[in-house]
Each structure stands twice: as C-alpha cells, then as structure tokens.
Amino acid sequence: MDYSYDLEEVVEETIDYKDPCKAAAFWGDIALDEEDLANFKIDRIVDLTKHTIHTVSGAATNISRPEKGRRTRKERRRSREKRASTSRPERVWPDGVIPYVISGNFSGSQRAIFRQAMRHWEKHTCVTFLERTDEDSYIVFTYRPCGCCSYVGRRGGGPQAISIGKNCDKFGIVVHELGHVIGFWHEHTRPDRDDHVSIIRENIQPGQEYNFLKMEPEEVESLGETYDFDSIMHYARNTFSRGIFLDTILPKYDVNGVRPPIGQRTRLSSGDVAQARKLYKCPACGETLQDSQGNFSSPGFPNGYSAYMHCVWRLSVTPGEKIILNFTSLDLYRSRLCWYDYIEVRDGFWKKAPLRGRFCGDKIPESIISTESRLWIEFRSSSNWVGKGFQAVYEALCGGEVKKDSGHIQSPNYPDDYRPNKACVWKLSVSEGFHVGISFQSFEIERHDSCAYDYLEIRDGSSETSPLVGRFCGYDKPDDIKSSTNQLWIKFVSDGSINKAGFSLNYFKEVDECSRPNNGGCEQRCVNTLGSYKCACDPGYELGQDKKSCEAACGGFLTKLNGSINSPGWPKEYPPNKNCIWQLVAPTQYRISLKFDQFETEGNDVCKYDFVEVRSGLTSDSKLHGKFCGSELPAVITSQYNNMRIEFKSDNTVSKKGFQANFFSEKKNNIQKLQQLNEVNRGQQNQAPKRVRPRMRLRTVKKTRPP
C-alpha cells in the first residue's frame, strides 16, 4: 500500500484552522493554547523542566515561577476551579457529534486508517464522526511540521487540526490522537497516579521531564474510574527514555500475578470505553452496530422490560449503502401518540434526524429503508406495564438510486475487505444542467488482466446499456471521471474468492466554469478541472499572485545539457521592473557555453538601466564574465566550472525586444582539445613560410626568315 506523503497542503489553502503547531506550548503530543497555560499551574512545570516548555519552534520558553506566598487571592481561587477539558462543558462535543475533514495530502490507505480509527471509537461509545458539511466547529486531519499532535477536546469557534505526522499513520496512534480530540488527557497524568506507577526521573531525557507531570484533583475529572494500566492514553514504560532499555514509568504492583503492561496502541481498553461513555452521557443500554447485518432487542426480551429505561442503537453501514430495518416482534404498552413506552426510528445519525416512525403496542411496523447509511433507534419506557418488548433485524443494501449533488460511495464494508459475492448498482443523478464528477480516494480490487472476477464498471448514463466509461480493477486509482449528462451508472461486483479493501470515491455536480462569458475570470487561459477550474498562461508568462492574471515569466534552475533562454515576453518587448535569474548546472567535468542569437536592451555605456550579467557559478559574487546591454551581440561565453548564472534586469522606463540565447554543455577535455586545436591552427598559420612567387624570365629568340 502507498503510505507516501504529498506535502502539498491542499485543504490548508482554503481552511483557516486552529493549528496545533502554533500552540503556546506542548505537553507531549498535546497542544496547549494560552487559555490552557493560564489555567494550569505553570510553576509546577518549570520546577521539573527548569524552563523547558517546548514551543512550536523547538525552542524553550522561560516562564518565571511566582514566589511562594505571593499568589493573589484571585489566583488561589482560580487554582481550585476545575480546569481539565473533560470537566469543562465547552470542551465536550455537543451530542457527541464530531464533524471531520481529511486533508488532500493523504493517500487512500491513510484515509482508510483514519476511518477505521473513527469507527473504532464509534463502535464502543456513543461518539459519532461525521464528514463535515456546513458545521462551524470540526476537525481537520492534516500533516503539520510538528508531527503527531492535537488539542484536547473541542476548541470551538471554527476548525481545529489533528496532525498525523510521518510514522504516526498507524491505527493505534490515530485512535490515541482521537482520544485527545474527544477530550482525554494522558492516563499517567491523573492526580492519583503515584499510587499506581513510579516515575524513574533519572532515566528521562533531559528537557522532557515536564511530560511526566501529574494534574491536581481540581484540574482533571477522572469520572470515578479506577487507574487504567491498559488505557490507550497511557505512556509506554520507556517513553522519553535516555535509552531504549531504560524504564521511565513502571507499575507499582502486580495484577493477577504479573506486572501489567502499559502503553498499548492496539484498541480501546474497557476503562477508555467506560470513561468516554460517562463523559458523553451515553445511554445505559444500546450500542453502535456496524456489521452488514444483525439484530437487536429491548433489554430482557422476551421476558419483559423495566420501567424508566432509555436505550439507543446506532446503525452505521458503509457510505453508499442503505439500511433495511424490520421489526420481528413488538409488545409495548399502548398509549395515545405512544406517549409512555415507544420506539423511535430516525433517518440519520442522531436524535434530530428526520423521524421515520414512533411505535408502540403490538402492531409490527412495515419495513423501513434508510435514505443514507445510518439509522437512529431510541427506546424509552415510563410505565410499569410488563410487555415482551421488541426485537428487530437489519441488513445493509448496496446500490440504489442516488439523487444528490454530492456524496460518497464506498465498496461494502470499506475500509475493511469487501464481502464475497456482492453485486451493487448505483444510479447517480445530479441537478439538471450539470455533469457528474467522480474522484477516487482509494482503490484496491482483485487484479486481473480483463477484470473478470472483481471489478468496478462505470457507464455514461442511467442504465447498463449506456456507453462504457471503463471497467476497473487492480491497485491503481482510476483517473477522474466526468459524465456527459447529469447521470452516471456504477456497478461493483465481487466473486466468491479473493477480497480486497475495495474503493472509496466522491461524486459531485460538475460544471464547466471556463464556458462562462468571463472565461472564469482568467486573463489568458482557463482550464476546467473536475470540481473546479484553474487559470493558466501562454508560454513565456506565469500566473500572478491573484492566480488569474498573467505576467511575463523568467528565470529558473536548469540541469539540461542544452537548451535556450530568453527575456520575458520574447519576442515582444520585455516588461518593466523584471529581475530574472537562470542558474544552469551541468554534470561534473562539464563546462557550459552560452551563445546569444538576438540581443537588444536599453543601451548605456555602463549598463546601468537594463542589462544581462553572466557569471561562472551560482551566486551573485561568482566570477563575472560580462555585463551586457545595448544592441551589440556578445561573444560566446564558456563557464569556468560546471555551472553558470545569468541575470536579466530591467528598470521602469524604456523596454526593448530583449534577448534570445542557446546554451550547451560539453566535457572539459573536449573543450580544452578544441581550444588547443584552435591555438595550434593559429600557430601554424603564423609560422608557415612565405610563398615566393616565381619569377618569369623572358628570353629573346632570334627568328630566321624561312628560305
């Protein structure tokens, strides 16, 4: 699988999130803002670290410690207030719903890991992760220079980042970081930790002592749970150690006859689950069901339920699937409007989703099919009437008609392996006048030369007879796809043998912005892309800072053996106030020659205004070969080494046609031989003897008259 990073921060260009890398300080992988620093007793941190609270730049920040006895009454009162995010309501996500966005700089495999980690939290708690639509507060999975870090709890007032740095894209580590997002500090910082673990300070790396601070009772709420060695939020025994075999934190006693292991990054512990359920006030009964089919029933079924019960079941299947829910048994107290005992079914992920039905009595409801991939089922009892309760079964249905302008479709059971013998057909329709655009996030389907076994088939239209766009399998993501109408037909098929991770794609309505009368606002060229567009420029020009206008381009770092360069806008007049630098680099033992074919700049005896400057080397103080201006063509220039620097400058007044030049590289020996041969030829011409023009002698012959 591809775990490489594309460091181009796609989401960051458009989202102004709360960046953990710009935090006031760090506490391990926890980002602290100014409010956190104001609320915590920083003097305790300084005692241990000797002025080493790590900032984002890696430098240390000095924080002076207040003298004992000098704290004000207000400060003493503030120290008694509860300060940890788990005890502060504003840091808890409302209704346990956490909207998220995954930045564009992650591969499909990494995105799958993030979703697996979120589903893990959902399965064991009542927390819900939801792809963000228009929510103000949400998290952004991104890759930041500070590595793996997050704020604790909801910060509010906009997006906040959770940074998943290199080597952090592992399931357990992402589950740990999401624990901070949900609202948990590290387990070993609990106030009662000294009763359970020993901190071996002499083994801690210098400057990292602050990571082993413990919080005071008024600063954290442990929610009545006992110390949890097995917590995924606990440090390992050698964390921040001077050596890999030196322990920094050790349990003080055995559990069931053995020293308990700490620092696991495999799954949530029972203690993690219990604390999260308490923090988010999860109902005492009910659960999150994520399998493709299953059943659930009221507590005690069929022997009756108790009064004053409250249970919630959250059914969640793969995006692109729907849920069919059938009640197989129903026996609740009957009342007008089902006022006392009832079951509510809502079409979505939470209690405010559209109501599909409220049921009581003994009449079994008709089948309910969800609009999307989630259902919310709530059961309440308030009477003393004893009935059997209810029982229900559900099943995930893949495919169907989808009439939305945007959304997600994934193979059944994604990001886990898809199931055998599946056949799913989706018919996508977006608004009239638009096209359907598809962009793949990940793709892994059993490989075959003709995609005969497992495959994804896409057709340009609304039926299986529409023109075929392609049949895809293997591990390479298909290119983006755009329909010719507002409809697209998608079919996924798996056989009974090999199963893979499947696919994940986004669909959306697509319009050609470049067809608008203003050319998309672009000065020269408009390039339509899937879901958007971009401006481009003609050869010799580059985009301006507004990403719409074009200006003459120039300069660059060139490693070709030969090529050409020219002034901006050539052969038109160059623009004013340009400063272009070309850096030419050839292989070692090569030399670069520059030959001007055309040359015309503003003329001046000392080349003060517009000029071309050529140097051997890459810096502005390298050996100067010449500074040229006017209309006289410079002679051929050969570099002293294997690199050359050419700089062109124009002022804000007169502009001329500029220049056009070719460069070529040859090995030093070849150039030396050529130079030597030229010198020999010149020498031979100088030393050759002068040719003597032969003299012509005239001899007079006396002619005799014939007889």
Swiss-Prot record:
| Limits of the Peptidase M12A domain | 84-283
Asked if Heme is a keyword of the record, the answer is no
Report domain CUB positions.
285-397, 398-509, 554-666
Q: Which residues form the EGF-like domain?
A: 510-551
The entry's Zn(2+)-binding residues are 176, 180, 186
Please name the CDD domains in this protein's record. CUB, EGF_CA, ZnMc_BMP1_TLD
Disordered, as annotated region: 57-90, 682-707
- Glycosylation sites (chain numbering): 62, 105, 295, 326, 562
Gene3D superfamilies linked = Collagenase (Catalytic Domain) (3.40.390.10), Laminin (2.10.25.10), Spermadhesin, CUB domain (2.60.120.290)
Active site location: 177
According to the record, cofactor stoichiometry and binding are noted as: Binds 1 zinc ion per subunit.
Q: What is this protein called?
A: Bone morphogenetic protein 1
What is the organism field in this record? Xenopus laevis
Source gene?
A: bmp1
